């Protein structure tokens, strides 16, 4: 899982 997934 990518912590940068917040950019959605």
Curated annotation (Swiss-Prot):
Keywords of the record: Membrane, Mitochondrion, Mitochondrion inner membrane
UniProt superkingdom: Eukaryota
Pathway field: Energy metabolism; oxidative phosphorylation
Entry's localization field: Mitochondrion inner membrane
Keyword Mitochondrion: yes
Any one Gene Ontology cellular component term annotated for this protein: respiratory chain complex IV
Principal location class: mitochondrion
Subunit structure: Component of the cytochrome c oxidase (complex IV, CIV), a multisubunit enzyme composed of 14 subunits. The complex is composed of a catalytic core of 3 subunits MT-CO1, MT-CO2 and MT-CO3, encoded in the mitochondrial DNA, and 11 supernumerary subunits COX4I, COX5A, COX5B, COX6A, COX6B, COX6C, COX7A, COX7B, COX7C, COX8 and NDUFA4, which are encoded in the nuclear genome.
Function: Component of the cytochrome c oxidase, the last enzyme in the mitochondrial electron transport chain which drives oxidative phosphorylation. The respiratory chain contains 3 multisubunit complexes succinate dehydrogenase (complex II, CII), ubiquinol-cytochrome c oxidoreductase (cytochrome b-c1 complex, complex III, CIII) and cytochrome c oxidase (complex IV, CIV), that cooperate to transfer electrons derived from NADH and succinate to molecular oxygen, creating an electrochemical gradient over the inner membrane that drives transmembrane transport and the ATP synthase.
Protein's name according to its UniProt entry: Cytochrome c oxidase subunit 6B1
Origin species: Rattus norvegicus (Rat)
């Amino acid at each position: 899982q990518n912590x940068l997934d917040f950019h959605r």
